[in-house]
A protein has these predicted regions:
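Intrinsically disordered, low-complexity boundary segments flanking structured domains
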Residues: 12, 41-46
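Residue-level recognition of conserved beta-strand positions in structured domain cores
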Residues: 25-27, 59
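Intrinsically disordered, low-complexity, charged/polar segments
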Residues: 46-109
């Protein structure tokens, strides 16, 4: 099994390729690392292959904030330059400048 380098970085704001939500990346797995139940819950027409980076996002849409787990192929850079309004963002990140968040000291792997 080969893994690829992650295209997106922790602290980067991204949006979903299909669904209307955006978020800030707070962790990344080199390959799919969630449950088979979760895998099968992804609509088959957009179900990605498992051998690619998967990102943990503090996500938001028009109605709510939540944590999302999204494959690299389903993400695009967010070019709005706007911060994410997720209530937990300030617990993980200390600042937002130039469209990118900076982790708080001591947060990380």
């Amino acid at each position: 099994m080969t893994t690829q380098l992650a295209k997106f970085a922790i602290g980067q704001v991204v949006r979903h390729r299909v669904y209307p939500f955006r978020g800030v990346i707070f962790d990344v797995d080199p390959v799919f690392s969630n449950t088979e139940e979760y895998w099968l819950s992804i609509p088959e027409n957009i179900r990605p292959h498992k051998n690619q980076p998967f990102y943990h996002l503090l996500a938001e849409n028009e109605d709510s904030s939540y944590v999302a787990y999204v494959s690299e192929q389903n993400l695009l850079p967010d070019d709005t330059g706007q911060p994410v309004g997720h209530p937990q963002a300030s617990m993980i990140f200390e600042s937002f400048r130039g469209g990118h968040y900076t982790l708080r000291p001591g947060i990380g792997h």
